[in-house]
From Swiss-Prot:
Its EC number is 1.97.1.-. Its cofactor is [4Fe-4S] cluster. It catalyses: glycyl-[protein] + reduced [flavodoxin] + S-adenosyl-L-methionine = glycin-2-yl radical-[protein] + semiquinone [flavodoxin] + 5'-deoxyadenosine + L-methionine + H(+). The keyword Iron-sulfur applies. [4Fe-4S] cluster 3 binds at residues 65, 89, 92, 95. Binds 3 [4Fe-4S] clusters. One cluster is coordinated with 3 cysteines and an exchangeable S-adenosyl-L-methionine. Induction: Induced by toluene, probably via the TdiR/TdiS two-component regulatory system. InterPro entries: 4Fe4S_Fe-S-bd (IPR017896), 4Fe4S_Fe_S_CS (IPR017900), Aldolase_TIM (IPR013785), Benzylsuc_synthase_activase (IPR034462), Benzylsucc_Synthase_activating (IPR023880), Organic_radical-activating (IPR034457), Organic_radical_activase (IPR012839), Radical_activat_CS (IPR001989). [4Fe-4S] cluster 1 binds at residues 29, 33, 36. This is Benzylsuccinate synthase activating enzyme. GO terms for biological process: toluene catabolic process. PROSITE patterns: 4FE4S_FER_1, 4FE4S_FER_2, RADICAL_ACTIVATING, RADICAL_SAM. Pathway: Xenobiotic degradation; toluene degradation [regulation].
């Protein structure tokens, strides 16, 4: 069984499914969405954050690194700083252990199913009283199907509501099929319905995602769709029409759709991971309401329940921005 590293266990979450939840973030995802705000969950291997503002240039990390990935240099104001080249990093994490100022931090911890259960079940009373539960997220939990199946089964057997957040990417349909019955809610990211863009930009074919999604629909599984509305990627009139047509055909099988506005909140993580140059959305503004509301209206017209996360509010049943369409909203 392929066992994932855990990047975070977030307790008392209100945004990853119904009620009060604990969200388990697994490290590893085969997709490479250029706007990803959790880049630390992409690579399945252990990594480290480097916080330059905490570094005092003592050189302890330089001394212990077997691959000589770090070296001391002087910056423009004459201060000694550490320069890191991660190309040959062996991921031994000796530099993290040697750092006295916590300028480095390990990303990804080893945890067994039993260890995760102990932590997640400690909040069972909150789940019961709020209609909440546990959400397995990532990364993508289907990147580790056996582990996810075991964790979901253990939670399900204890009466805990289980959700997973996934792109439904597996090319082997049996992976998704094996989750039906032990997962109470599938939260599926549907980033675009343009097959060429999906492959060229995200690096993964669209066909298996739609096939898996339709498997869930046919099985009567509870499915909620997340659509991240990304400027210049999936916010055109053609995109709106494609989403409305496809999802409208399956309206009866979809419990709701959440439109998520783009933001740059994760940009700093790329820098801390040594990947600052790979982030393509630096300086891009959040998705404007005029790009999200038409999509919400088109989906609502097809009989779908729609929420807009973090952009449009409701006051007395009226949309605060448009005044003409009442949408449920998550902040």
């Amino acid at each position: 069984m392929k066992i994932p590293l855990i990047t975070e266990i977030q307790r008392f979450s209100l945004q990853d499914g119904p009620g009060i939840r604990t969200t388990i973030f697994l490290k590893g995802c085969p997709l490479r969405c250029p706007w990803c705000h959790n880049p630390e969950t992409q690579d399945a291997r252990q990594e480290f954050y480097f916080y330059p503002d905490r570094c005092v240039g003592c050189g302890r990390c330089v001394a212990v690194c077997p691959a000589e990935t770090s070296r001391l240099v002087r910056n423009s104001d004459g201060r000694t700083i550490v320069q890191i080249d991660r190309t040959n990093c062996q991921r031994c994490m000796r530099c993290v252990a040697a750092c006295l100022t916590e300028a480095r931090a390990i990303v990804g911890q080893h945890m067994s199913v039993d260890e995760i259960l102990r932590e997640a079940l400690s909040d069972s009373a909150f789940y019961r009283n709020s209609g909440g539960g546990v959400t397995i997220s990532g990364g993508d939990p289907l990147y580790f199907p056996d582990f996810t199946r075991q964790l979901a089964s253990e939670l399900h057997a204890r009466g805990v509501h289980v959700a997973i957040e996934t792109s439904c990417f597996p090319k082997q349909g049996k992976v998704v099929e094996s989750m039906i019955g032990i997962v109470d809610l599938f939260i599926v990211d549907l980033k675009t319905l343009d097959a060429h863009k999906h492959l060229d930009v995200i690096g993964w074919p669209l066909a298996p995602i739609l096939a898996n999604l339709e498997t869930l629909f046919a099985a009567g599984a509870k499915v909620r769709i997340h659509i991240p509305v990304i400027p210049g990627f999936n916010d055109s009139h053609a995109d709106i029409d494609a989403y409305a047509e496809y999802l409208g055909k399956h309206a009866a099988a979809i419990s709701g759709i959440d439109l998520l506005n783009f933001h740059c909140y994760g940009e700093g993580k790329y820098t801390f991971l040594g990947r600052a140059g790979s982030y393509q959305y630096s300086g891009v503004d959040e998705t404007p309401a005029e790009k999200i509301v038409p999509l919400a209206q088109a989906l609502k017209a097809r009989g779908l329940a729609v929420t807009i996360g973090g952009i449009v509010g409701i006051a007395n049943g009226k949309n605060e921005l448009t005044g003409d369409i009442a949408l449920e909203v998550h902040h």
